[in-house]
Amino acid sequence: MSFLNTINIIGSGLTAQQLRLDVVSENVTNSQTTRVENGEGAYRRKMVVFEAVSGRNSFRAAMARAAAGAVPNAGAAPNAGGVRVTQIVEDEETPMKMVYDPTHPDADEQGYLELPNVDMVMEMADAMAASRAYASNVTAFNTLKSVISSGLEIGR
């Protein structure tokens, strides 16, 4: 695996986790929003969907070629790919919170107010997980930098 390919993989992980943190912060920010821009109900929690990106020389692709009877190229450098965000989806499964507040302008005829389905504990857990995954990618990048630097020192 080339160093540049490794940097691309780490970069894709950093980008994906940054987007995950952005979505968590949007959820926390809108945790009390009772009406979205189009005026249709309260804000719904959003979630990020990730997908592993398999390169042309990834382990999965090599196994598929071997199963098809192709002779694997032993000298080929693996191209693992990384990770990408496929979509940001709204949480349709978690019910909205209903609170009795007849004085609120967005309350229904019975006086109930629909609040977002954002659970602050879940959001904090997601933020911590994304932050740790981001930090792991930074550590991997720093390790790669150290390896490259050591290689350059040996070459002198």
Which sequence ranges carry the predicted segments?
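Amphipathic alpha-helical polymerization modules
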Residues: 1-156
